[in-house]
Amino acid sequence: MRFGLPSKLELTPPFRIGIRTQLTALVSIVALGSLIILAVTTGVYFTSNYKNLRSDRLYIAAQLKSSQIDQTLNYLYYQAYYLASRDALQSSLTSYVAGNKSADNWVDSLSVIQKFLSSSNLFYVAKVYDSSFNAVLNATNNGTGDLIPEDVLDSLFPLSTDTPLPSSLETIGILTDPVLNSTDYLMSMSLPIFANPSIILTDSRVYGYITIIMSAEGLKSVFNDTTALEHSTIAIISAVYNSQGKASGYHFVFPPYGSRSDLPQKVFSIKNDTFISSAFRNGKGGSLKQTNILSTRNTALGYSPCSFNLVNWVAIVSQPESVFLSPATKLAKIITGTVIAIGVFVILLTLPLAHWAVQPIVRLQKATELITEGRGLRPSTPRTISRASSFKRGFSSGFAVPSSLLQFNTAEAGSTTSVSGHGGSGHGSGAAFSANSSMKSAINLGNEKMSPPEEENKIPNNHTDAKISMDGSLNHDLLGPHSLRHNDTDRSSNRSHILTTSANLTEARLPDYRRLFSDELSDLTETFNTMTDALDQHYALLEERVRARTKQLEAAKIEAEAANEAKTVFIANISHELRTPLNGILGMTAISMEETDVNKIRNSLKLIFRSGELLLHILTELLTFSKNVLQRTKLEKRDFCITDVALQIKSIFGKVAKDQRVRLSISLFPNLIRTMVLWGDSNRIIQIVMNLVSNALKFTPVDGTVDVRMKLLGEYDKELSEKKQYKEVYIKKGTEVTENLETTDKYDLPTLSNHRKSVDLESSATSLGSNRDTSTIQEEITKRNTVANESIYKKVNDREKASNDDVSSIVSTTTSSYDNAIFNSQFNKAPGSDDEEGGNLGRPIENPKTWVISIEVEDTGPGIDPSLQESVFHPFVQGDQTLSRQYGGTGLGLSICRQLANMMHGTMKLESKVGVGSKFTFTLPLNQTKEISFADMEFPFEDEFNPESRKNRRVKFSVAKSIKSRQSTSSVATPATNRSSLTNDVLPEVRSKGKHETKDVGNPNMGREEKNDNGGLEQLQEKNIKPSICLTGAEVNEQNSLSSKHRSRHEGLGSVNLDRPFLQSTGTATSSRNIPTVKDDDKNETSVKILVVEDNHVNQEVIKRMLNLEGIENIELACDGQEAFDKVKELTSKGENYNMIFMDVQMPKVDGLLSTKMIRRDLGYTSPIVALTAFADDSNIKECLESGMNGFLSKPIKRPKLKTILTEFCAAYQGKKNNK
């Protein structure tokens, strides 16, 4: 093994990296990681503090700036208030109101105002108004007042305009915002003048108003003062009120530094949830670390509203983000530079230290290479001494050596070994150490782990200092360092009595340097030197190892034989499943090649298409299983509601169960589960439930029940489940949902037993049609369900209408609906999600939880034997593995379900009792991310999924009988136990369209009405009688539809009755039925009469048409071996006999092998019986011939082979052929 860098770079793992490089990288990563963690923590902490401190500083600066503004305005206000409260003005206004309108009345007032204006350069113009806002007195400062333009005066005298005035004018006054006059800013302050001329009245009232135009330069100087505000920008904004008196906008009082001078004239809107809105409307101050509201770039700012009553201003102090973050940026640069410098220093220091530290390991590596190359262990002294010494050391170290090996070495005491030079080889009888190949094999075997049987064969010893490890090497973890050093000292001092080595072994040994400290590396060196001596004893273990390996090979052989047997069973089953649709495809193709009638060819193509779809379904199951086995299936998690799963199951299987006359109930418990938005792969969950429900419907007889219960069990205990490796789904204690779902039925619901409720979908549908007080949530659910149903069944109905076919496509409801279910679950929204605006499903919750959801599917089918309840989850295993099994399939459904459940950390369990039914429980944990509110709905859970709902009452209606009502309630297929009578299963779509009366197929007049291809068929069509053909597992998936459309005899197919409208496997029928004999009464009695025993409808049609092409028209069909026995018995009692019987091997009830034995033994039937089977294996052929069959016809059936069989075994066919 080389530790250095390779000469060529290896691009595939494991990558070769020297231990020196690894040590350097490890130390560097630890040092740099620690520095980075410290640097990041420090940087984040101080950066956050810097930001907080600097934002607080901006806020304090804004407060100071607003205080300065308040002081300036208050100074101007009190001077103006002083003028407004002068007695001269009050007396003049009182006299004016009393009727004295002469000029003499205003002389004193004018003098007072003139003195006030001339006393300061701050005031320019003063104008007095009466209470009706009429100007009665105007005075100006001769120095500046006459120089103000008219447009500026108009904006500064708000009382002279028609602009609405604020109500504060009547109490404290108003202040206009500064207006630019050339280079200076002016503003005006309007105050009310209160007077009380009466000595009787105590309250003063407003007799007039005074408006004073004053300079705003003092305010401007406060605005421009940026003392102690480095790189800061100051802004003052003023609120703009609308006609309702609300602050709807703002503008700048003064243009900020660097902006245009006309910026104060622009009004900006106030957005909600901004600091401007909070400051204007709530009077709150504060700071922002990052915003771009007042600038195009990011800035940090502090703001504080002014407290002056006449204005609504906000002072703002802002800084660019680069200035605001400059201290934090500087600190980050310092920390980064320091980390990089320290990292470089650590790396440079680590390189020489790592070189020095790995030198002992390098020496150990070189010594190992010498031993690996086969050099060393060449004894130069007589082998007797060396071997004895070696064994002595072995015993002292705890080794036990077989006595045979000791005897062998003693016997060789007289032999000697010669050493010649560095590469000399030793010669001795039986010395295995001299062969390089033996050395390499010994080392290689030593590196392998010993199997468990070797532990039992471990050689006992009485020494506890050292033991032989499981891989054959010394376990020196148990050796003390003193004993090792003692051995080494003894080895150096007594070389004549211990194992001596050649020059190569001397090179292999590691030198023992004098050390200051003893560590693991020194122990490793001593252990390595001891290991070279332990190689002798290693060979003693080889025999035991070979014996243990032999036992392993024997066990592996048994396991391989079991696997081979399982493979044979799988090949037999899958061969039957695949060959059955292939028989339909190839057989009908061969028939179509011989046909010239377009209708017959089209009908054959339909059977080919349905067989191809069934074959595709089987292959899809196999591929899905293979994908799960290879762990390439990935969960696609998303938000969904458990109601989505219930709706999908209802929309897919509701009609299926109704047509099958099986009561399907779906319930959700408790109602809290409906409000949860869960996170998981809803498509895979729907797939699992669909497989379980499909299985339940397949095995449930007519008038049976299938219950689907979705429960909330409690909170998920992830730690305990993970500890148990997710073998079970555990619930936290105290969170269990203890309320019993099976409570007393207060609505008189139909029950399956005394303690179990059932939600009958058929009665639910009736209730939906009769109850008009449906709540809002039910309307939404119904709407979604309608959309899902339309999307699922639209294709099937369209295909039926376009093809004018009585039988729907063989694509199963579960297969075709699954794709639609995925689509609907992704694009349809759950009720109550408030998702019309494009928002997310539901609303988030503060504390997301993980819940345990249980989905139970219980049926009243035949049940599963306890011995098979665990094996049914294995791939390709079914509850009934015999040839006479009633239900087919690949046996992958439950295996796929368990695989998907394990992927979700869930479980799949089965409880079943033979003769009672089965219950599959799928339990999994799901995270709740959101919740749905139903607060606005009066009855949010009033639907068919609630057992307590009024919609689950069974309501019966008395409807007048009519043709349509008779057709809508036409009889369905009878159970398998009654094969003497046949009825028609009609889909609701077809029933509503039918206009003719349907008669029983079992009418004894049928045989007389079917005369020939023309006349007999016309009579059959006139009376609208539909002959029924046996339904097999290949057709069980088809919809139960007998349309009122008429099929001609040339199409070769009548209307088909189906027990089960979902997909089963091929080649298995669910019930036995009377098959109308297809025969021609005009034929003479010497015509060939053949019985075809086949449970698959497609195979029946293939062989029947092939026989028709051979000129054989007198053909009878049977569905299973029991019916074949009855037909042969009935015909034998009349003194007649079939010329030949074609017998399928795998059939329900009674398989072909047992039926053949019964016919031969009990009825004495001697005519030929030819086997029909899809498993064309030599062992199967031999088994058929031993049962009493004469020939073998494999599927897919080929016409030349069929013709050969007829020629070989049917004498009547040969005679008929010769007559022609």
Curated annotation (Swiss-Prot):
PROSITE patterns with a match to the protein in the record: HIS_KIN (PS50109), RESPONSE_REGULATORY (PS50110)
Modified residues (4-aspartylphosphate): 1144
Chain intervals for the UniProt region annotation (Disordered): 414-433, 444-500, 960-1016, 1040-1081
Coiled-coil region(s): none
Binding residues annotated for Mg(2+), in chain numbering: 1094-1095, 1144, 1195
Pfam families noted in UniProt: HATPase_c, HisKA, Response_reg
Job description of the protein: Histidine kinase that acts as an osmosensor at the plasma membrane. Part of the bifurcated SLN1-YPD1-SKN7/SSK1 two-component regulatory system, which controls activity of the HOG1 pathway and gene expression in response to changes in the osmolarity of the extracellular environment. Under normal osmotic conditions, the histidine kinase autophosphorylates His-576. This phosphate is subsequently transferred to Asp-1144, from where it is relayed to 'His-64' of the phosphorelay intermediate protein YPD1. Under high osmolarity conditions, the histidine kinase is no longer active.
Protein name, as recorded: Osmosensing histidine protein kinase SLN1
Lineage: Eukaryota, Fungi, Dikarya, Ascomycota, Saccharomycotina
